[in-house]
Regions:
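A bilobed periplasmic-binding-protein/Venus flytrap-type ligand-binding module shared by bacterial periplasmic
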Residues: 2-3, 81-99
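Solvent-exposed loop/turn segments at secondary-structure junctions
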Residues: 7-9, 58-61, 94-97
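Short beta-strand->loop
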Residues: 68-83
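Short helix-initiation/N-cap motifs at beta->coil->alpha
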Residues: 26-43, 128
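A ligand-binding cleft/hinge motif common to bilobed small-molecule-binding domains
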Residues: 51-72
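An extracytoplasmic/periplasmic, membrane-proximal ligand-sensing/linker region
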Residues: 113-140
Length: 140
């Protein structure tokens, strides 16, 4: 799971998320990676080199405002799997549906049991659309 060095708080959140995934989805063998900036994150995601990323709400809003072309590329090549209070877990369109389901269900279970930091927070004004599987698996 990658994040950008320029996205404040994303790396610590990613590391915490990996601890939770190691507990609830150990077969994923999740690891953290940091990219130098939004451009590199978008490149790695869109070319399927690293299919998952954590980005903050602020980072995404700033990217849309400061580099609309890069935001458009990210928007076209990604979908949201899970939304937290201040962060989003996104993936590319190549990520297998069974992996989406496993991650969503594991995080939802972790939040219900004891990990408030991964509580799902539905966003109405989402910049990157949810994967349809999210709505099938999580009842709103």
């Amino acid at each position: 799971i990658m994040c950008s060095k320029k996205d404040e708080g994303a790396f610590q959140f990613t590391k915490n998320l990996i601890v939770i995934l190691d507990e609830y989805l150990p077969e994923a063998k999740a690891r953290a990676a940091r990219t130098r900036d939004a451009e590199r994150l978008t490149d790695l995601l869109s070319t399927n080199q690293i299919p998952l990323a954590i980005i903050s709400n602020n980072f995404l809003v700033n990217l849309q405002r400061e580099d609309s072309n890069l935001f458009k590329v990210l928007f076209e090549h990604s979908k949201t799997l899970y939304t937290f209070k201040d962060m989003l877990l996104i993936t590319n369109h190549h990520f297998p549906e069974q992996h989406v389901i496993a991650i969503v269900e594991s995080l939802f279970k972790a939040a219900k049991e004891k990990h408030d930091s991964v509580t799902f927070v539905k966003k109405a004004n989402l910049k990157i659309n949810y994967d349809e599987v999210v709505f099938q698996k999580l009842k709103f």
